[in-house]
Swiss-Prot record:
UniProt name for this protein: Glucose-6-phosphate isomerase
Record has Transport as a keyword: no
Gene: pgi
Organism listed in the record: Salmonella agona (strain SL483)
Enzyme class, first EC level, given as a word: isomerase
Keywords: Cytoplasm, Gluconeogenesis, Glycolysis, Isomerase
Keyword field contains Oxidoreductase: no
EC number in record: 5.3.1.9
């Protein structure tokens, strides 16, 4: 994987000139000048997903120049490096192989001279056996009752991914009730424990090292709560399992290491739902549906690794994102799923993107002088329309948006889905084409009103349009299509990081706050005034101590 400053390439210089030509061209003009624009700027994946990127401020020349940038920064080489098991996470000396976890073709993937697939398959088989015992009721709690509730205790990648997927696949769920606890705020675990019965609850403690502060604090609180009823510590083994590699700490906690599900250092946290971290997904929707999720992701992996860049969906979306972020100065991207089950999708890729590409140091160790990762945010439609779409339509910020919707709903209730999708289609049209002053005035005339008498209102009803969007229309949200969609975004993130010459798979930015919190924690143990920090931090700590007394 080469270290190439993208701004020093001839393609970047060409894109700068091209931007000067494109900055005042409107999406409306692009459509008016090309009746085949949709056909040229859209593509389908496996007849399950249509990606329409025609409502963007791009031409074929734009894409060609962006593809030149990908070539000059050796994106193809970076893709090969990842899939071949090269240690592309150089700051931690690790391979990056979440693709191995869903390698359904089972072709060998070599890390340090060893094929990782036998171990991957062994853990999958172990999860299958365990989950079937829980789901069938064969596994009994300490009083002989079957498990009814599962509580996943994790944070970051050990929480966001499984929670997002179990919500997205709720139509496929079985009888088990799923709960997720992440925040070290005691309120989170306390509220979940109010809902469950210690006799019928299984806790999954998801921490690779079994030392994560938030996770272990919650796990010990759950254990204490459980033992208040169960009494004997030997019963912990019937109600706790671990997603970890620290067998010693797992055993000391009271968990049978036979119920410890391992994963590897080449699995990054925010790419770990495909690993043992996905056990909560299996317990929610069953092993077969989890395999379908893996299969969908594997299909997208094959598309990404074998399809020419000009037709490669993750690459195309990544390049368009770089175009807006670095040339138009767009700082954010909104992910807007028109499906209530997908309500955690934007939050999941907020972590996926911002923790991956939120870096200001390039792979050479130098501060960059260009934009790297964007701010990611979003909410389900149509809720967002009544919240923040005002700014997207008429604000002063450019916010490129991804609209996502299924053609087939899991809940065909009356005409709800037609109304939902009518909004999905309408919003991208409105954002692209807007509404001119002439149209506003004509609407007044059609209503029998004199525009001249409403001159003071007319400017406020004008929509400039020219707001870029991608539309991702799925046939239906199934385990397979969801797996493919997640992998699409994962590879988009990787592509941008590779081109922008940053390390996508470390996250040193989370460490400093942890270090300082560990230093401050002992200072909160008494009522002494603190003076060892800056005046602001001292003032905050001392006021906290005064108010808690």
């Amino acid at each position: 994987m080469k270290n190439i400053n993208p701004t020093q390439t001839s393609a970047w210089q060409a894109l700068q000139k091209h931007y000067d030509e494109m900055k005042d061209v409107t999406i409306a003009e692009l459509f008016a000048n090309d009746s085949d624009r949709f056909a040229k700027f859209s593509a389908t994946f496996d007849d399950l997903m249509l990606v329409d990127f025609s409502k963007n401020r791009i031409t074929e020349e734009t894409l060609a120049k962006l593809q030149d940038l990908a070539k000059e920064t050796d994106l193809a080489g970076a893709i090969k490096s990842m899939f071949s098991g090269e240690k592309i996470n150089r700051t931690e000396d690790r391979a990056v192989l979440h693709v191995a976890l869903r390698n359904r073709s089972n072709t060998p993937i070599i890390v340090d001279g060893k094929d990782v697939m036998p171990e991957v398959n062994a853990v999958l088989e172990k999860m299958k056996t365990f989950s079937q015992a829980i789901i069938s009721g064969q596994w009994k709690g300490y009083t002989g009752k079957a498990i009814t509730d599962v509580v996943n205790i994790g944070i970051g990648g050990s929480d966001l991914g499984p929670f997002m997927v179990t919500e997205a696949l709720r139509p496929y769920k079985n009888h088990l009730n799923m709960h997720f606890v992440s925040n070290v705020d005691g309120t989170h675990i306390a509220e979940v424990l109010k809902k469950v019965n210690p006799e019928t609850t299984l806790f999954l403690v998801a921490s690779k090292t079994f030392t994560t502060q938030e996770t272990m604090t919650n796990a010990h609180s759950a254990r204490d709560w459980f033992l208040k009823t169960a009494g004997d510590e030997k019963h912990v083994a019937k109600h706790f399992a671990a997603l970890s590699t620290n067998a010693k700490a797992v055993g000391e906690f009271g968990i049978d290491t036979a119920n410890m599900f391992e994963f590897w250092d080449w699995v990054g946290g925010r790419y770990s739902l495909w690993s043992a971290i996905g056990l909560s997904i299996i317990l929610s929707v069953g092993f077969d549906n989890f395999v379908e999720l893996l299969s969908g992701a594997h299909a997208m992996d094959k598309h990404f690794s074998t399809t020419p860049a000009e037709k490669n969906l993750p690459i195309l979306l990544a390049l368009i994102g770089i175009w807006y972020n670095n040339f138009f100065g767009a700082e954010t991207e909104a992910i807007l799923p028109y499906d209530q089950y997908m309500h955690r999708f934007a939050a999941y890729f907020q972590q996926g993107n911002m923790e991956s590409n939120g870096k200001y140091v390039d792979r050479n160790g130098n501060a960059v002088d260009y934009q790297t990762g964007p701010i990611i945010w979003g909410e389900p439609g149509t809720n967002g329309q009544h919240a923040f779409y005002q700014l997207i339509h008429q604000g002063t910020k450019m916010v490129p948006c991804d609209f996502i919707a299924p053609a087939i709903t899991h809940n065909p209730l009356s005409d709800h889905h037609q109304k939902l999708l009518s909004n999905f289609f309408a919003q991208t049209e409105a954002l692209a084409f807007g509404k001119s002053r002439e149209v506003v005035e004509q609407e007044y005339r059609d209503q029998g009103k004199d525009p001249a008498q409403l001159e003071h209102v007319v400017p406020f009803k004008v929509f400039e349009g020219n707001r870029p969007t991608n539309s991702i229309l799925l046939r239906e949200i199934t385990p397979f299509s969801l797996g493919a969609l997640i992998a699409l975004y994962e590879h988009k993130i990787f592509t941008q990081g590779a081109i922008l010459n940053i390390f996508t798979f470390d996250q040193w930015g989370v460490e400093l706050g942890k270090q300082l919190a560990n230093r401050i924690l002992p200072e909160l143990g008494d009522d002494k005034a603190i003076s060892s920090h800056d005046s602001s931090t001292n003032g905050l700590i001392n006021r906290y101590k005064a108010w808690r007394a």
